[in-house]
Amino acid sequence: MPDDSRISPLDQARILSEALPHMQRYDEETIVIKYGGHAMGSENVARQFASDIVLLEQTAINPVVVHGGGPQIAAMLQRLGIKSEFAAGLRITDAATIEIVEMVLAGSINKQLVGYINEAGGKAVGLCGKDGNMVTAAKATRMLADPDSNIEKVVDLGFVGEPEKVDLTLLNQLIGHELIPVLAPLATSKGGQTFNVNADIFAGAVAGALKAKRLLLLTDVPGVLDKSKKLIPELSISDARKLIADGTISGGMIPKVETCIYALEQGVSGVVIIDGKTPHAVLLELFTNQGTGTLIHK
């Protein structure tokens, strides 16, 4: 983004004029934003993101932030000499690892982001899915093909969960009252066991329960790419499923798109996958005519 000092007053006025109808469209609407771990790697980017979230709240939008923390968890595990293992894109989380995951997500990252938002003039409240039994999860399982026999088998992911229920009681006490919920993707089972939940999946479940106007997934890529690696600006659910089937959408993008589809089917109006490293990515998507990333809709 260009330095504000290089933008003439007239251009600044035009920018604000372009933003107005978009602000009106999202007036008093809930926007769920998933902020990824890699995009959080720079303090400057994190502070800029926090400032943008405060701007949303100041324009009568109700932002709900869900953050990840994969790189930070990996760094802490490495420091403690614990090996990181993954299966089907999910971190295998044993008893020792879940304690570290909870410490990093609900402690370090969550409170740091809350601090940045508060320093920018907002009123952030740091929570995780365990608070108020907000998110109840069941143990996640995945099927993977054995590399030798090619026979599929169930992989034990440990304390990794998938949301079963979202209780909005606590969130509804915050949303619309000038408070910004900042959620760490941890959940609890009916028996009280803590589960690590993939942040995209967690955000999709929360957005679906809230019937959010938008779910924004901030990632490390510009959005969904075609086979020529060009950005696809817009997709319907049926388009997305076809691209998964023909291999255009592959690897780590598949669970993200599946989360988008789930959220849409639960009542979210639109989901956008955008590059979280782009300066002011959230504002570009919500407040400009062109937007950014890939919009997925029904």
From Swiss-Prot:
One of its GO terms (cellular component) is cytoplasm. CDD domains: AAK_NAGK-C. The record marks K34, K256 as: Transition state stabilizer. Substrate binds at G69, G70, R91, N196. One of its GO terms (biological process) is L-arginine biosynthetic process. InterPro entries: AceGlu_kinase-like_sf, AcgluKinase_fam, ArgB, Asp/Glu/Uridylate_kinase, NAGK-C. It is an enzyme of class 2 (transferase). GO terms for molecular function: acetylglutamate kinase activity; ATP binding. Its EC number is 2.7.2.8. Pathway: Amino-acid biosynthesis; L-arginine biosynthesis; N(2)-acetyl-L-ornithine from L-glutamate: step 2/4. Keywords: Amino-acid biosynthesis, Arginine biosynthesis, ATP-binding, Cytoplasm, Kinase, Nucleotide-binding, Transferase. It is found in: Cytoplasm. Its main location: cytoplasm. It catalyses: N-acetyl-L-glutamate + ATP = N-acetyl-L-glutamyl 5-phosphate + ADP. Coiled coil: none annotated. Catalyzes the ATP-dependent phosphorylation of N-acetyl-L-glutamate. Belongs to the acetylglutamate kinase family. ArgB subfamily. This is Acetylglutamate kinase. The gene is argB.
